[in-house]
């Protein structure tokens, strides 16, 4: 079985960042202004689905990207059924 990503929001963060015309460096700087000390490398890992994002971080992302929390999630995540079947493991 293919390993599922550690987060579902990464691709949407990347899409919203690009739509806002921001580089990873610029978004990381804006996140830092809003209270999240995140490097460009950390943001890259989030966008790639390799780093988890906790609840507080989701709020900062939504605020910084000027979107609703629901805007950070895909409309239909591809791997939800496997996560549910495996008990989130």
Label every PLM stretch briefly:
Residues 1-19:
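A short, Lys/Arg-rich alpha-helix, primarily the initiator
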Residues 2-3, 63, 70-89:
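Short, charged recognition helix plus adjacent turn
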Residues 4-8, 37, 48, 52:
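Residues at secondary-structure transition points
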Residues 6, 18, 32-33, 48, ...:
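Residue-level detection of the helix-turn-helix DNA-binding "recognition helix"
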Residues 11, 21-22, 38, 53-56:
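Residue-level signal for the short linker/turn that defines the boundary of a DNA-recognition helix
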Residues 13, 17, 27, 61-62, ...:
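Hydrophobic packing within well-folded, soluble alpha/beta domains
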Residues 20-46:
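Short alpha-helical DNA-recognition segment
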Residues 50, 54-71:
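DNA major-groove recognition helix of helix-turn-helix/homeodomain DNA-binding modules
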